[in-house]
């Protein structure tokens, strides 16, 4: 049994749908609120959370008449209370308040809090048996088996909100799980798609941030340039759809129009296409199992003219190879992969290491973790958070050696 409903299970929702948005002030939250804004007659907002942007959070709470609002930073509670003083909106601060927001009664929850901080709130929504649109990578990369098992046990539905996984979700509805032979996740190739390995090694921060298609945050844009982001998506797809690494392929597609493909036993391949706009997969999750009016630009294939595809290069982009290695290793290795990458990207942004050293730090951390005998199954959110914390410490310890080798 899967928590991801590959077929319409009769879950159509009549009347007004109650919504909670965890991470309402981030980029995914912004796209979600834009869609809610377009159809106020269909949705009622229960809870909203934000990290530290109190002004933005309070503005959204008032606009959508939220029942409860939580800010992750405990020090901002007074500021939030003051901003909402002329309303009857309840508010809180800190991790417990964010978890409370996730636990409140809502038909549909957008889990878009970034980082490991999003794991416990997403689990709180899952444990309530909610329909959860999942945009937090750590829930799957750091605790995939555990998270999906909890969702099944609670009767929760997990709807993939990431563009590639949502594409697979839509394409999988064309057949049955036992008929699937492989899924294909597409990658733009990033700004260094045609660069030589030596040039990629020396790439600057400004060059890494020039994504050809998507407008994203700094960290994810760098991950796209290194293809670490695609590695994370391979890991996520494995847990979401119960796929082995051998059932997941990556295909470089520079135009970012085809987002995912599914091949079935009869060798039919079903693909999902759309403009590179996160409002498309979010709208699919928001309306599921129905469809709602979109806010993104309509796709004009004649204007685009051609779609091209290439095999990924695991030599120039070793981060993708390392993701498959971590997935096959299991026992927390994918958590280590993600944690080490976050340390490496932060070091690159701070100009402590070269771009090419990002993958080397991830590989050295993974190897060090295995040699230390740290591999073990994760059976709780605290287990996953502990591995994440300790892997970051190991990566930080290895960082000076990596930096010295590159100098």
From Swiss-Prot:
| Leading EC class | oxidoreductase
Protein residues bound to NADPH = 25-28, 53, 136, 138, 217
The UniProt annotation places 1-deoxy-D-xylulose 5-phosphate binding at 137, 163-164, 188, 211, 224, 229-230, 233
What EC number(s) has UniProt assigned to this enzyme? 1.1.1.267
* Keywords (A to Z) from UniProt: Isoprene biosynthesis, Manganese, Metal-binding, NADP, Oxidoreductase
Pathway field of the UniProt record reads: Isoprenoid biosynthesis; isopentenyl diphosphate biosynthesis via DXP pathway; isopentenyl diphosphate from 1-deoxy-D-xylulose 5-phosphate: step 1/6
GO biological process annotation, one example:
isopentenyl diphosphate biosynthetic process, methylerythritol 4-phosphate pathway involved in terpenoid biosynthetic process
Q: Which Pfam families match?
A: DXP_redisom_C, DXP_reductoisom, DXPR_C
Where is Mn(2+) bound in this sequence? 162, 164, 233
* Catalyzed reactions: 2-C-methyl-D-erythritol 4-phosphate + NADP(+) = 1-deoxy-D-xylulose 5-phosphate + NADPH + H(+)
Record-level Gene Ontology MF annotations: 1-deoxy-D-xylulose-5-phosphate reductoisomerase activity; manganese ion binding; NADPH binding
The coenzyme or cofactor needed here is: Mg(2+); Mn(2+)
Similarity section = Belongs to the DXR family.
Question: What is the stated purpose of this protein?
Answer: Catalyzes the NADPH-dependent rearrangement and reduction of 1-deoxy-D-xylulose-5-phosphate (DXP) to 2-C-methyl-D-erythritol 4-phosphate (MEP).
Q: Which NCBIfam families match?
A: Dxr
- The name this protein goes by in its record: 1-deoxy-D-xylulose 5-phosphate reductoisomerase
Gene name tied to this protein: dxr
């Amino acid at each position: 049994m899967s928590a991801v409903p590959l077929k319409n299970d009769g879950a159509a929702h009549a009347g007004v749908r109650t919504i909670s948005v965890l991470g309402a002030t981030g980029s995914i939250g912004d796209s979600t609120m834009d869609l809610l804004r377009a159809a106020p007659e269909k949705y009622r907002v229960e809870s909203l959370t934000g990290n530290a942007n109190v002004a933005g959070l309070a503005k959204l709470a008032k606009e959508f008449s939220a029942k409860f609002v939580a800010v992750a930073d405990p020090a901002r509670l007074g500021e939030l209370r003051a901003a909402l003083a002329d309303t009857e909106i309840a508010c809180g601060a800190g991790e417990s308040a964010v978890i409370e927001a996730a636990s409140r009664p809502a038909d549909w929850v957008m889990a878009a809090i970034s980082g490991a901080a999003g794991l416990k709130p997403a689990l709180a929504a899952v444990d309530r048996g909610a329909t959860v649109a999942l945009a937090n990578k750590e829930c799957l990369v750091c605790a995939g088996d555990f998270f999906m098992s909890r969702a099944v046990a609670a009767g929760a539905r997990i709807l993939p909100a990431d563009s590639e996984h949502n594409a697979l979700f839509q394409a999988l509805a064309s057949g049955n799980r036992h008929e699937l032979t492989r899924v294909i996740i597409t990658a733009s190739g990033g700004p260094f798609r045609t660069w030589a390995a030596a040039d990629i090694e020396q790439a600057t921060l400004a060059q890494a941030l020039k994504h050809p298609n998507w407008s994203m945050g700094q960290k994810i844009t760098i991950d796209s340039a290194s293809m670490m982001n695609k590695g994370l998506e391979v890991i996520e797809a494995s847990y979401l759809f119960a796929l082995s690494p051998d059932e997941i392929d990556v295909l470089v597609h520079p135009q970012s129009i085809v987002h995912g493909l599914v091949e079935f036993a009869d060798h039919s391949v079903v693909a999902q296409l759309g403009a590179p706009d996160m409002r498309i997969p979010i709208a699919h999750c928001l309306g599921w199992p129905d469809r709602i009016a979109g806010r993104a630009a309509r796709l004009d294939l004649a204007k685009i003219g051609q779609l091209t595809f290439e095999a990924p290069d695991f030599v120039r982009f070793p981060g993708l190879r390392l993701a498959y290695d971590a997935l096959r290793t299991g026992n927390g290795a994918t958590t280590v992969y993600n944690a080490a990458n976050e340390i490496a990207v932060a070091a690159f942004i701070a100009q402590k290491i070269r771009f090419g050293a990002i993958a080397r730090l991830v590989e050295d951390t993974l190897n060090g973790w295995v040699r230390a005998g740290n591999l073990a199954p994760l059976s709780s959110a605290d287990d996953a958070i502990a591995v994440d914390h300790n892997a970051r410490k190991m990566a930080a310890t290895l960082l000076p050696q990596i930096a010295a080798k590159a100098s």
